Amino acid sequence: ADWRLLRSEGLLIGKVSSQDGENYQVQFQLFDVYKSQQLVGKRYNVPASGMRTLAHQIADIVYETLTGEKGVFSTRLAFVTEMKNADGSKRYALQISDADGANPRTVLQSRQPIMSPSWAPDDNRLAYVTFENAKSEIFVQELSTGKRQSVASFRGLNSAPAWSPDGKKLAVTLSKNGNPEIYVLELSSGKLSRVTHNSQAIDTEAVWMPNGREILFTSDRGGRPQIYKVNADGGRAERLTFEGNYNASADISP
C-alpha cells in the first residue's frame, strides 16, 4: 500500500512470534513514509509476563523518535482517592499505578485528607501532605520498603513539597513564622533554609528549575497571583508573568 496516499507521515510495523508458548520474540520497525527510511527498529525476546511492560517501552521509543521528547508510557501515576464508609465518614488512600491506570497499589490509607503527592527523581520515593496528626505535615515515603518519615511538622502550614532535580532537597511552603513562605529542606541533615521574605504575601507552589539553582513559585505580593523566580539559596525574587490577573502553578517543560 502507498501510505502517502493516506497522508501518513509514519508507519509502524510489528510482529510477535511464539517461541515455546511461554516466551515470545517481538519485532517492530518505524518508517518515515515520505523519505522511505527506517527511523528505528528493534527485536526483543520476552516472557509472556513481560509483554505489557515491553509494549510500553516500545511506545516510549516510538514517541521519542517522532517527537524528540521522552515518552511517559513506562512512568507511574500517584494520586489520592476519596471514599465513603458505611457510616458516611470519609477515608482517603494514596495510590500509585501505571501511566494508563493499570496495576493500582495503595501506599497509604488515612481517615484524614492526603494532598500534594510528589515523585522523587529516583521514582522510589513520594513526598506528600497528610493531616493524620490533626495538622498538616509533610512525609517522605519509600515505595520499595513502605518506610515513611515526617520531614516537616512545624507550627502552621506545611505544604506543597517539590523535589530538587538531584533528589536531595525539598522546596516546601511553611507558615511557621507567619505568612506562607518558600523554604528549602535538606533531607539528609534536616537543614532548613528560608528562600522568600515577604511579610504581606502568600508564597507557594514551588517548582525547581532543571539546573537545581533556581525555583519558580506563585506569589500574590503584587496584589494578584503571579509567577516569580528566585535563587534556591534566597535573594531577590524576579516576577516572570505580567499578562492576566491570575497566573499560578508553574511547570517546567522537559
Predicted regions, residues:
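Structural motif
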Residues: 22-25, 86-95, 135-139, 179-183, ...
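Hydrophobic beta-strand positions that form the internal "hydrophobic ladder"
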Residues: 77, 123-127, 167-171, 212-216
